[in-house]
Amino acid sequence: MPGIIGLITRMPREWAEPQLQRMVEAIRHESFYATGMWIDESLGVYVGWAARKSSFCDGMPLSNERGDAILAFSGEEYPEPGTARRLKERGHAAEAEGPSYLVHLYEEDPAFPASLNGRFHGLLADRTRGTAMLFNDRYGMHRIYYHQTKEAFYFAAEAKAILAVRPELRRVDPRGLGEFVSCGCVLENRTLFEGIQVLPPASAWILRAGAIERKDSYFQPREWEEQAPLEPEAYYQEIREVFSQNLPRYFTGKDRVGVSLTGGLDTRAIMAWYKPSPGSLPCYTFGGTYRECRDVLVARQVARACGQSHRVIHAGGEFLSRFPHYAERAVYLTDACVEVNRSPDLYVNEKAREVAPVRMTGNYGDQILRRLRAFKPGEPVPGLFVPEFLAHVHAARKTYNGLLQTHPLSFAAFRQGPWHYYGLLALEQTQLTLRSPYIDNDLVRTNFRAPESTCENNDLRVRLIGDGSPTLRRIRTDLGFGGRVGYLPGAAFRRFHDFTFKAEYAYDYGMPQWVARVDHLFSPFHLERLFLGRHKFYHFRVWYRDALSEYVREMLLDRRTLSRPYLDRGRVEAVVRGHLTGGQNYTSEIHKLLTLELLHRLFLDGDLPQNTQRTQVKTVQSAP
């Protein structure tokens, strides 16, 4: 994921600058990335960056008029309208568009970066104070890793940048690995790599002379948790006002915006209130090969009702033919924070970038407005892992249960967001800029005042859509919400699509073993065609069994895989052969095993892969 990297050190420049160069090279993954470095030897600051060309944070670093405040910023910030103008009226050289206002905001706002709104991280060097401040957004969504040695403090948007210069860290952390196996992500700001941590949300750490001076935090969730709750009608009016007034901020900037339109409520609400002029906002939906899924069918209706173009981006034969590439790339780009089943997302986002470099989504709408919990610990198939490692897997459940002892919205926004959702966000942002109005500061703060009754169903969003566009209110969602009035027709419609949704899950990776054996007997009839593709666009149970069987066999029955110390060799062989030829369903286990093996091959065994975009990174500015 594009971002900043670097080190703070008192070591000589001849020691530090080559490391910075290697760190920048490690995260330049695409030809459309812009990279650079800035160095101040007197402060011991060595900072670099990678940014998508023409994006909000292209053109770093930022400087004030005197040149004593320098900012390297990554991500996006959605300020109050008129912020740059007001700073210019106070004598600052802030441009009307772009991020230049940020460094001037630091000069005016003693609480900086508390007023910022978005997903971001940055390093601000203050030559007057002789310090550097490393900061991130209040949700911790724009991740930054760090590592401290006696020589330097390292920080990076991707762990691989630190691994590139500190090879002794290329060893797995057993606790983090156990959490990843159990929960699908690492908890409590740990990582898969021993000695590398994640900067906590809302950090504003002060660094001096190559070390951490203070670990400040500019925000605590209790500031929002302790607000007085609102009555249902007052809450709805407040949410409606915040959503409608702040939404236009997310459509600003130089780059073209496309909407990743689904059949659900969250993108529908965006379309209902943004009201784009006809033909100005390209829309697209991700689809599969069996049939047009409900997302495609409904999204097409929504786009047509709004006067916008719509296209389907398919993940099918081309993707499957290059699955090894996309699987390995997905794991590598995210520092193994996603499993290989997210590789289709890399493929479709490459295609989405051709439509528009900014992708508007409804991400996090359910999690914020309804406080939904999207992940929980799982139990591995018996015997797959050796008992010594299984203890770490079981410990993850205890850790997770402890983390639930907080406000449910705080869990969703400040824990689930930066841990569970980070991997997919990081993967997608390697290709384009993702935006969502559902983690807007004002909206999340207001949602902490929601009465519990409004979080129990979809009524609030259906009403919000209707107030913005009665036409869009009349189109049923992919699962049958909204649309025509009348209990029986609506209830029957919802029951039918709820059944097809669950049936697709049961026929894909959720298929019970006894059903898998029956399905195996009838495999010549391809019964999957009856169920798959109605709601999802990827189908790994069948793919692993058929199109990807050779890759699965070569990877997981390889002697290197079978020799991993935490795996039971015989059980791994039984899982692979059972899924490929024995009429059993081990889709989730194969996801995990492939991901763990790629973790070893890409990060732990031998040298890190060479970046195909490797070029000499220029130092755009340097201070003696």
Give the location of each predicted region.
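Conserved structured core elements
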Residues: 233, 237, 241, 268, ...
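Glycine-rich phosphate-binding loop signature in dinucleotide/nucleotide-binding domains
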Residues: 252-254, 352-356
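Cysteine-centered catalytic environments shared across enzyme families
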Residues: 1-318, 325-326, 594, 600-602
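Glycine- and acidic
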Residues: 224-233, 257, 283-287, 329-334, ...
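Catalytic metal-binding/acid-base residues of hydrolase active sites
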Residues: 266, 364-365
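Conserved glycosyltransferase catalytic-site signature
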Residues: 98-102, 117-119, 174, 296, ...
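Adenosyl-5′-phosphate
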Residues: 1-7, 40-41, 164, 194-196, ...
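ATP-dependent adenylate-handling ligase core
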Residues: 288-348, 366-384, 400-402, 431-432, ...
